[in-house]
Design a protein with these regions (language model features):
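Catalytic cores and adjacent flexible loops of soluble metabolic enzymes
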Residues: 1-116, 120-274
Length: 274
């Protein structure tokens, strides 16, 4: 039987990676129905990172903006996820523990299902407290392995990190290849190794297209057992952004995976509203 691979539209990161501002809340709520109509996304990245800061620059209330933006996806049965910086929350400097605990409760109340937590240093001590905070708030805790290429960052290095995060109770693992420099075969070995540690752990692959590895990497991680792939959409895909959903869908379908079909009329609606 074909193995299913699901797609997540990294809407927030598409804009950030293109150097563009996130749309206003009225624009977000206008494009949401067309994204849903495309029929191919199991998840959408709706907030986190620098999203709320941009809302503030627009003079918008981030709390209201995120609630209105996530609402139609929930009604359609699509999960929403956000990015957070572990010890730093949404900032670039440490945040007190009591603030971080409240932060996840607020995000859940706003309508965010999954929190993707990362530490640029790959220090699990910075990530593990967030697992408990997310669970206390009723959120799914997805913890990241930040991918780079060096003599130190071996397959064993990443598997040891994944094992510690899984033992600490994380629900999912994200292979966060944010520079797009992970080598395809290497990443396939990492994913396969994680599935050996815990067969039913959900793995989501996030990558950027710049260096040119990521289409091959997507194929390799899916062959190794990856469950979700982050994708972008033209005109904000490729380059410093992410692989386009059309290309990823075609490649995986040709490779024998079960992937969702794309409503191309809706795709063009989304493009015209981005």
């Amino acid at each position: 039987m074909e193995r299913e691979v699901k797609f997540s539209l990294v809407f927030r990161d598409m804009w950030q990676s293109a150097g563009k501002y996130v749309p206003r809340v009225d624009q977000l709520t206008k494009v949401a129905p067309a994204i849903i109509e495309m029929g191919c996304f199991a998840r959408v990245e709706t907030n986190g990172g620098g999203f709320e800061q941009v809302n503030l620059l627009f003079g918008e209330n981030p709390n209201k903006a995120v609630r209105e933006w996530t609402k139609p996806f929930h009604e359609a049965g699509i999960q929403t996820h956000m990015l957070d910086r572990a010890l730093n929350g949404l900032r670039m400097s440490p945040v007190p523990a009591d603030v971080r605990k409240l932060f996840y409760k607020v995000k859940k109340a706003q309508g965010t299902d999954i929190t993707r937590t990362f530490c640029g240093l790959n220090d699990v001590r910075n990530i593990i407290p967030s697992i408990g905070y997310a669970h206390d708030a009723g959120m799914i805790s997805q913890c990241c392995l930040c991918i780079t290429y060096s003599p130190v960052h071996t397959v064993e290095y990443y598997l040891d990190m994944a094992k510690k995060l899984i033992e600490a109770g994380c629900d999912e693992i994200c292979i966060k290849d944010m520079a797009g420099i992970g080598r395809p075969v290497f990443l396939g070995k990492v994913v396969a190794g994680i599935k050996q540690i815990k067969k039913d752990i959900v793995i989501q692959y996030h990558s950027h297209a710049g260096p040119g590895f990521n289409m091959a990497s997507i194929l390799e991680v899916c062959k190794a057992g990856c469950d979700y792939v982050d994708v972008g959409m033209e005109p904000l895909s490729w380059g410093t952004g992410h692989a386009d959903v059309i290309s990823v869908q075609a490649m995986l379908k040709d490779a024998g995976f079960k992937v969702p079909e794309i409503n191309m009329q809706a795709y063009m609606k989304v493009r015209s509203r981005e």
